[in-house]
C-alpha cells in the first residue's frame, strides 16, 4: 500500500542524503519484484518521484545508462513541467548526459530548458541557473588550481542557494551543489554527501 511505498522512498532518500549508494542499490534490488517492476501501476506523480530516487541511486553508483533509462518515461511527460519534481528530474537527466559526455545533447537541452525558463518565469529556480552555468564549463585540461578558482567563484551563489527556503526544498530532494563540487574536484559524490551529512548532523545536535 501507500505506507509501504512511502517507507521505500523515505529509505532511499535517507541513503542518498548520507551518500550511501551501495546500500541503496541493495535496497532497490530487494524491492525490485514487489515495487519497482510494478511502478507503472502507480499514479503519475508517484511514478515520477520513485523514478527520480531510483535514478539518483544509479547515478551515485556510476550506472549512468540505467539512470537515463529510468528517467526516460517521465521526461516525455512535458505537461508536468511546472511541478518542481519534474524540473528536478529534467536537471538530473542533463547531469546524466554530462556524465556520459554527450555534449550535443547537453547543449540542445540547456537551450530548451532556458526557453522553458523564460516562458515560466514564475517557476524559475536559482539552482537551475546555477547548474546550467556549470554545464557550460569545459573541464578538459583544467588543472586543480583552475578548478579550485572556478569553485571559489561560485561560493557566493552556493551560499545564496542554501540560505533560500524555496531553493532548499529542491536541494533536500537532491544536493545538486554537492554533485557540482564532486565534478569540479573529481571526487566521488558519496564523499561530498557524507561530509555534508556529518556537518548537518553536528549543526542539528547543537
Where on the chain are the PLM-derived regions?
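Short, small-residue-biased leader/transition segments that mark boundaries at the very start
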Residues: 1-4
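Short, contiguous acidic/charged loop-to-helix segments that flank catalytic cores in large enzymes
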Residues: 41-45, 58, 79-85
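Active-site-proximal binding-pocket segments
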Residues: 64-65, 74-77, 83-92, 102-104
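C-terminal non-catalytic interaction modules
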Residues: 102-206
Amino acid at each position: 500500500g501507500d505506507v509501504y511505498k512511502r517507507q521505500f522512498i523515505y529509505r532511499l532518500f535517507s541513503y542518498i542524503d548520507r551518500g550511501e549508494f551501495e546500500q541503496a542499490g541493495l535496497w532497490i534490488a530487494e524491492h525490485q519484484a514487489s515495487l519497482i517492476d510494478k511502478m507503472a501501476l502507480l499514479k503519475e506523480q508517484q511514478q515520477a518521484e520513485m523514478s527520480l530516487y531510483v535514478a539518483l541511486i544509479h547515478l551515485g553508483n556510476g550506472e549512468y545508462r540505467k539512470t537515463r533509462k529510468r528517467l526516460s518515461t517521465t521526461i516525455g511527460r512535458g505537461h508536468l513541467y511546472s511541478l518542481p519534481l519534474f524540473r528536478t528530474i529534467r536537471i538530473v537527466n542533463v547531469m546524466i548526459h554530462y556524465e556520459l559526455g554527450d555534449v550535443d545533447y547537453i547543449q540542445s537541452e540547456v537551450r530548451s530548458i532556458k526557453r522553458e525558463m523564460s516562458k515560466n518565469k514564475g517557476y524559475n529556480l536559482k539552482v537551475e541557473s546555477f547548474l546550467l552555468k556549470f554545464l557550460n564549463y569545459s573541464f578538459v585540461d583544467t588543472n586543480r588550481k583552475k578548478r579550485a578558482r572556478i569553485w571559489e567563484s561560485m561560493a557566493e551563489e552556493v551560499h545564496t542557494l542554501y540560505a533560500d527556503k524555496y531553493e532548499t526544498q529542491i536541494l533536500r530532494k537532491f544536493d545538486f551543489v554537492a554533485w557540482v563540487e564532486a565534478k569540479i574536484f573529481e571526487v566521488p559524490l558519496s564523499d561530498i554527501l557524507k561530509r555534508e551529512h556529518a556537518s548537518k548532523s553536528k549543526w542539528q545536535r547543537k
